């Protein structure tokens, strides 16, 4: 690629190969002090191979990056990103799902209000419980995104083993999804992966990937949760044994397609990956959507903490968002049948 061609892009553009910067256009050179031809590419940009799109932090600011693999290397097109509240399509989807759930509550309680039944049990209990968990999940998502848009979202900072967090999530989700014929496998590194962050938030971000993948395998199959490290970055991905999502489907997961669709009744409100992206941003990481055909859909990436004695700034613990209920059941409530959720209900 000639420099003249690179300068024709209206946004900052960087061409790199083998983790080294080959060229930057004039806009990128003016914007980034640390990126120049011959220098090292920031680790977050090569934490995931292939073509992808996502929001990352570069020199202290958030940018929307689209990476495209070309013959001469990978081209990165960079756009400044503004903090925003729920997107219009996401808000429509959330309100649509809330109306559906309120209708479910009315239908499930109507026979008792009319005196036709006097004991709340059996299938009615199962459906009511499932609707309750789904409503709780929806409210959790909207609450977190609202706080993030207002700049009021904070994370506890504690030392965590990301390998352990992933292993526990795979075990807990596997025990639940096993009843649907879905097996969850975990593949991680040989040792611990130390990170600094909020364990509950990171767990919930991971559960969004598992939940989305489980929806694709409702008739059974295998989900594979993998954790790997490259340099000072950790990378998490969840895949299944079915066909990989198309590029259009993957962009639709984050509501960034040309015509984002409001999810159907059993597809959630479409907020899950936005929540995961918000959590990763809060931890200095990113949610990256692989745009290549046949590639896994979504990655979570974040920096590891290898330095001992690192100084941490501690925050006051935030509110417990799951009302003390099983977070794995909440995350999978759009996927699991009612009888499986009922077992966790305590009167």
Q: Which residues are covered by each model-predicted region?
A:
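Sensory modules in modular signal-transduction proteins
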Residues: 1-28, 94-96, 103, 147, ...
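Short beta-strand/loop element within the Bergerat-fold HATPase_c
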Residues: 222-232
